[in-house]
């Protein structure tokens, strides 16, 4: 570890389940310094972010809902590396959050899913013009990246594939960003999957799931008791090949989050996907 000043970090969505894990991980990383904790929930205003995350000692960083003043404060810190904001908020607010951060020269690391392709392109253009690094990562789990790589390899040999993603019932968007990204990676091969051999009729609309690119179907499940799970199921005459990743604890995302915080400072534009920085 060098003697360089620690990276100043803001966590947006700090009172949420992922936000609390991020606060805890940052507090335990000697090269990172939590300067701000943002959350819109009224019941958490003024509470210490460390105590809320379950740390034994307070961090003396109070939860606030004032994003712009915090961005300005961190941007005004001229000593040490530029600031980073980690966003685990909501699909309705993440786009504006990221634009505001880039405008202040703060590097966004975005774990919130639900951004449309057009929004991602707009943010990419904005980051490019500002020469500011930005990372949008649908899934911070290294295990999920390995699953996606295995799926790309398998899709060269199988012509039929469907994706099932399962999440807790507080997740706001469907399908998950990870499932969409997985389908996009398979579609990049340029082949069409799941050529129909019969004319299908959905007796209930949506029964066959949502249709992604190149004929790939995604099925979404939302239930209490789940965290985050994904299956990629390949089929061929006489065989089924299933890839599955299960998240049992949100701590599995933290190595990817910390890596992204450190890597985003080296970027001058928007990068999409954890696999691009491994």
Swiss-Prot record:
This protein's GO CC annotations: cytosol
GO BP annotation list: diaminopimelate biosynthetic process; lysine biosynthetic process via diaminopimelate
Gene Ontology MF terms in the entry: 4-hydroxy-tetrahydrodipicolinate reductase; NAD binding; NADP binding; oxidoreductase activity, acting on CH or CH2 groups, NAD or NADP as acceptor
Pathway the protein takes part in: Amino-acid biosynthesis; L-lysine biosynthesis via DAP pathway; (S)-tetrahydrodipicolinate from L-aspartate: step 4/4
CDD domains: DHDPR_N
Compartments, record wording: Cytoplasm
Stretch forming the signal peptide: none
Main location: cytoplasm
One Pfam family from the record: DapB_N
NCBIfam families associated with the record: dapB
Alphabetical list of HAMAP family matching this protein: DapB
Family: Belongs to the DapB family.
Name under which the protein is recorded: 4-hydroxy-tetrahydrodipicolinate reductase
């Amino acid at each position: 570890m060098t003697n360089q000043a620690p990276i100043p970090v803001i966590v947006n969505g700090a009172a949420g389940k992922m936000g609390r894990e991020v606060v805890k991980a940052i507090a335990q990383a000697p090269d990172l310094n939590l300067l701000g904790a943002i959350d819109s929930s009224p019941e958490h205003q003024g509470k210490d972010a460390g105590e809320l995350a379950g740390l034994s000692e307070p961090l003396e960083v109070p939860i606030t809902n004032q994003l712009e003043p915090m961005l300005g404060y961190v941007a005004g810190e001229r000593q040490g590396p530029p600031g980073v904001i980690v966003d685990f908020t909501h699909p309705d607010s993440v786009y504006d959050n990221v634009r505001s951060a880039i405008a202040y020269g703060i590097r966004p690391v975005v774990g919130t899913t639900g951004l449309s392709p057009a929004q991602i392109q707009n943010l990419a253009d904005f980051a490019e013009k500002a020469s500011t690094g930005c990372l949008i990562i649908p899934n911070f789990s290294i295990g999920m990246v390995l699953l996606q790589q295995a799926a790309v390899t398998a899709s060269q040999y199988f012509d039929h594939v469907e994706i099932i993603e399962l999440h807790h019932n507080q997740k706001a968007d469907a399908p998950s960003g990870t499932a969409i990204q997985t389908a996009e990676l398979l579609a990049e091969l340029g082949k069409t999957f799941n050529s129909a051999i019969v004319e299908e009729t959905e007796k209930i609309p949506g029964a066959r799931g949502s249709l992604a690119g190149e004929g790939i179907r995604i099925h979404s499940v939302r239930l209490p008791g789940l965290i985050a799970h994904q299956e990629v199921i390949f089929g061929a005459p006489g065989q089924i090949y299933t890839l599955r990743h299960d998240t049992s604890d949100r701590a599995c995302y933290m190595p990817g989050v910390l890596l992204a915080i450190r890597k985003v400072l080296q970027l001058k534009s928007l990068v999409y996907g954890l696999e691009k920085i491994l």
